[in-house]
């Protein structure tokens, strides 16, 4: 506490001097640059330590999964913003990131929260199938969509899910959260009477939980990864522009019925 009774400000992330930068206890120049991957650096920032080899493989896998998904609303928003403000690449990326909502890329935290809260205090031998059934029943009773299920494009199967779970299994990180997510998918499918396949955000929410990440930061995984993809969209916009064409066509087609013939 300070003399005025206020809590002293404190950060454990990094510090620097005129000739040194230290991040989470590691000298940036000597220990990290040229020695760790971008994914490992992100893990270090979030967890306060470098990952083990299995953790590195799994964390990098979920980050790679979230970098790119084509011409999504966030990518279009980034391109259009760059058209209007080419002096502000960071503004265009930010515009795209603001589009990472519950439909595209964002709800990793919803899935992680559902899983972490469902298993909070549960004993090691807990009946996961019973927990899954209870989660689905509660979500449906509240009129909510079950997090981590369904996709507007990948109707029958999200091809990223089996590969993510395979990587997790190969690295010893396919545990209760992954098993519960799969059981929730099965229970939701039975309750709905139609297929509700797991999507990538559900898989990533489960794997992030296996890695011990709190659900509150799990949407940040999508933010970090998709920023890379959005920079690539802006680079492509410089090489193969489409934003101006999108603007022109929307302007013409949306008001076509109002124009005199």
Predicted regions: what they are:
Residues 1-261:
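Non-transmembrane, aqueous-exposed alpha-helical and coiled segments at domain scale
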